[in-house]
């Protein structure tokens, strides 16, 4: 792995992302609009909910949505022949994958900052210290690895970026409805417990409540980290073996 090559690739990928209006909307403006919409709905005490309950799910959803953009990006690069051209250069696959992972981590940090700042005026009052805030950011960065891995798996089984967009929702929707936005019941909990998003959301809720010693923080962080590492390794393996053709 070469740091110089990774830095050059990282710069290229970030410039490519921010030159595309669709990517800017999906990655930055959409989380902002969703936060504002949820703020107006759930920030009103008449609805019996608060942004303190909703915000952890918004943070997780921002990371989940990366699945689609990663799948689109890799499918586009494959369709344009960019990946094959990279194979003829001194660039190693580890440099390419490393820069892709880092670029998405940067986007996750931006998304989390946007959601955090916009949620504050709507009554989001995290009862934690600076360590808790940093821990929440770290948790979202770790969680983003699973989304990158699922994006790679989606790109592997998709013949085009358009198909990748549709298939990505196979991974997005279950994580949205099982423990991120929708309350978990005794019926849905066995399914939700398999979702990294559920454990990440539960850990975030405990962190923002100020209870850093809550077992949900440790178990949520541990499950999310292990699941994310397994998924990203599987995604890289499948894409290198079957998707880069």
Task: Give the location of each predicted region.
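Hydrophobic alpha-helical transmembrane segments of multi-pass membrane transport/permease proteins
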Residues: 16-44, 51-71, 108-111, 168-177, ...
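Hydrophobic alpha-helical transmembrane segments of multi-pass membrane transport proteins
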Residues: 33, 50-121
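Transmembrane helix segments
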Residues: 37-45, 155-198
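Short hydrophobic, aromatic-rich alpha-helical segments embedded in or entering the lipid bilayer
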Residues: 3-9, 181-221
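Aromatic- and glycine-rich beta-strand/loop motifs that create alpha-glucan
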Residues: 1-30, 80-81, 245
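Alpha-helical transmembrane segments of multi-pass membrane transporters/translocases
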Residues: 37-39, 202-245
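Short alpha-helical transmembrane interface motifs in multi-pass membrane proteins
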Residues: 19, 23, 52, 63-68, ...
